Structure formats: C-alpha cells, structure tokens
C-alpha cells in the first residue's frame, strides 16, 4: 500500500527548514548584516523576492502538524466519534509533548540572546520572568507579551486547540469544511489577525490526511512518460502544499 510515510514528512520538513533559512537570511538587505552575498546565477532582486516568498515555510509546518494529528486521531477513532473528554486529553498530551520538546532549544536561545545583548523581553526582572514563562508555554501572543519566536511557536498551540473542533466539523460536512473556514478567515484577515493567514491550512490538512490525497497522487500516472509523470506530480503536490 502506498503511504505518505514519516520519511516523506521529514523530507518535507527539511524543505520547509531550507525555506525558513532562506527567508530569514536573504529576504531583506538588513538581514544580511552587511555581508556581501552572491546570488549567482540569479539577479539579487529576484533571489531576494524568491526568499521572501519562502515565508510559506510556517504554513508547511502547520500543514504537516495537522496532517499528523489527523492520522493519529483516525487510528484510534476511524469515524472521529470522540467526545469532549477524549479531545481534551488528546490536546493536553500533545501540548505537554510539544512544550517538553521545545524546552532545551528555548532555554538555550534565551541564554544566547541574553549573553549577546539581543534580549527580546521588556526590561525589569519581574516583567522578564513573566514574559519568558508566557512565551515558553505559547501564550505570549494571547496576552500581548513579547516573544522570542514571534510566529510558529504560539501558532502551534492555537492550531492544536482548533484541531478537535475542525475535525468534528469535517466529520459532519466533509470537504465543505474548507468553505466554512474561508468565511471567518476572510473577515478576520481584514482585521489583521495573524492566525487567519494559516487558518485555511487546518481543514485542508485534515481533508488531505483523511482522503489520502498524497497516496492517490503518488499512484496517479497522468502521462506515459515516467519522468514527465513524476515532474507533473511534483508540480501538483508542491502547489497543494
């Protein structure tokens, strides 16, 4: 049976990390720190524009997270017929695992920013401690605090909280969930709510995982030429992600 395996997930994560590095290092002149960078064979403006577009790495991480969460829940509840207590425990376990995984790199980065005088938190011992604690648990953005990681860390928690609700909506409305999410998303984007940039990813990842879209795409043979078929499938799958 053809499956979108953990190995495939790690490969996509590797691509997303490459996007992340390009975006943070080369999307703006100020981010190069005055260093002379050669973008050969591309013109510098074009290379920087491509790097700027790689901000979609956050969306890729969010997609993979929800995709994995859906498969995990589906393995236990094929019909997604779980109750509120089960959903709460599922989110809580994932949240604890998420926080513990982030503990070492977070503490390390806080230490480095303190030593290099690039600290992101407000002045004052008490305010710093409160901000660090809220940031670590992913709730800094919710309470208006300063954050060391300004996007995907708090977003990972918000996506986790949305997931059980989105899954129940999908259970009832199937693919229509994407249209249902687009309506509030379009309204909130006008209000400059950061989460809505990635809100559409949640139902899409759920649909892709449940309907085995990648598995079907992998077994799809659109052209007689194997090489051209692989290239076409690569283009289609990249566009989907």
Descriptions of predicted regions:
Residues 1-186, 230-234:
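Membrane-cytosol interface segments of multi-pass membrane proteins
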Residues 181-241:
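Alpha-helical transmembrane segments and terminal signal-anchor/GPI-anchor hydrophobic tails
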